[in-house]
């Protein structure tokens, strides 16, 4: 089997590192570096386990894209730190001690020569979805703690799998179409697309998406298993001769405007204008700028984490 292209959900991983690694981990100058250490260590573990020859850390260049807010104004509204004047992009509420650590992580990635991928006006989910969908050569492994990305699983044209970090990296679960279909009771031949439709119907309070009132995950899965797709569900709801329960038909039809809007909000983009910070996503076996990498590692007090990353790289074929 070919070595995979690994796509890391940057924000998902450094948020989990921030909350999962003790804040007592500090740099020599006293600044917290728990997220930095956790992120680098997690990357080393993923490299050791998956043995990629290509890798990109995918970034939110816009964590709350306007096209999604225009469709559903409540989208991530509860995460806005303070409304910005004059149409400026909203700022996400982030722990004060995490923000500077994100800059540290990006400095280290840049010094090491590890590709960072982003697209103006799009979230990391869209970047991941675009890169996974357009890959035609290598199998793809998406690493994230965001269930929304289960919609990108595929078998063709290349295998796309999601390493879901819901319970942490040590207990991560690898999902492909078969696993998504089995776990959620969805049609196996379109498990990824069906998962997006399940999420749309169920809703997601963490993203400010209400879902269809009275339709939970179990009901949504049953509808998709029975009818095959969201379009067919809505066609059945609109058909007076359908066997669908009258109460359920009423709920779906009452929510038809929401369903139409949420369809574009929930599905990840697969055509985002993604660019890389490096000429290639080929994974460097040694730091591109070893002096700067060493200086940053010393300044941030993460020499041991960088050493573990290099040890993981040393196991990869040249």
Curated annotation (Swiss-Prot):
Signal peptide: none
Documented EC number(s): 3.1.11.-
Classification via Gene3D superfamilies: 5' to 3' exonuclease, C-terminal subdomain (1.10.150.20), 5'-nuclease (3.40.50.1010)
Segments passing through the bilayer: none
Entry keywords, A to Z: DNA-binding, Exonuclease, Hydrolase, Nuclease
Pfam families: 5_3_exonuc, 5_3_exonuc_N
One of the record's GO molecular function terms: 5'-3' exonuclease activity
Domain 5'-3' exonuclease per the UniProt entry, residue ranges: 194-278
One GO term describing the cellular component: peptidoglycan-based cell wall
Gene Ontology BP, a term: DNA replication, Okazaki fragment processing
Biological function: 5'-3' exonuclease acting preferentially on double-stranded DNA.
Protein's name in the database: 5'-3' exonuclease
Protein source organism: Mycobacterium tuberculosis (strain ATCC 25618 / H37Rv)
């Amino acid at each position: 089997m070919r070595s995979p292209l690994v796509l890391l959900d940057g924000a998902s991983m450094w948020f989990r590192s921030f909350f999962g690694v003790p804040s007592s981990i500090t740099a020599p100058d006293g600044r917290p570096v728990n997220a930095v250490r956790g992120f680098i260590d997690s990357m080393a573990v993923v490299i050791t386990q998956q043995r990629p020859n290509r890798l990109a850390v995918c970034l939110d260049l816009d964590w709350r894209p306007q096209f999604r807010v225009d469709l559903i104004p409540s989208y991530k509204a509860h995460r806005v730190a303070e409304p910005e004047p004059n149409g400026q992009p909203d700022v996400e509420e982030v722990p004060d001690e995490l923000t500077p650590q994100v800059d540290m992580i990006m400095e280290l990635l840049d010094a090491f020569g590890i590709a960072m991928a982003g697209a103006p006006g799009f979230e990391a989910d869209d970047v991941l979805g675009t890169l996974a969908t357009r890959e035609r050569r290598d199998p793809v492994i998406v690493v994230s703690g965001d269930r929304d990305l289960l919609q990108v699983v595929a078998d063709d044209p290349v295998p796309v799998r999601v390493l879901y970090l819901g319970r942490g990296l040590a207990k991560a679960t690898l999902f492909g179409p078969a696993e998504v279909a089995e776990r959620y009771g969805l049609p196996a031949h379109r498990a990824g697309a069906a998962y997006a439709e399940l999420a749309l119907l169920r809703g997601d309070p963490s993203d400010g998406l209400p879902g269809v009132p009275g339709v939970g995950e179990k009901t949504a899965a049953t509808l998709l298993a029975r009818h095959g797709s969201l379009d067919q569900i809505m066609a059945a709801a609109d058909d007076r001769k359908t066997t669908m329960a009258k109460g359920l038909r009423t709920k779906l039809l009452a929510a038809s405007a929401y369903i139409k809007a949420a369809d574009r909000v929930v599905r990840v983009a697969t055509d985002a204008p993604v660019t890389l910070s490096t000429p290639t996503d080929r994974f460097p076996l040694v730091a591109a700028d070893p002096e700067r990498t060493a200086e940053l590692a010393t300044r941030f007090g993460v020499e041991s984490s960088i050493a573990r990353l290099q040890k993981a790289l040393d196991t990869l074929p040249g």
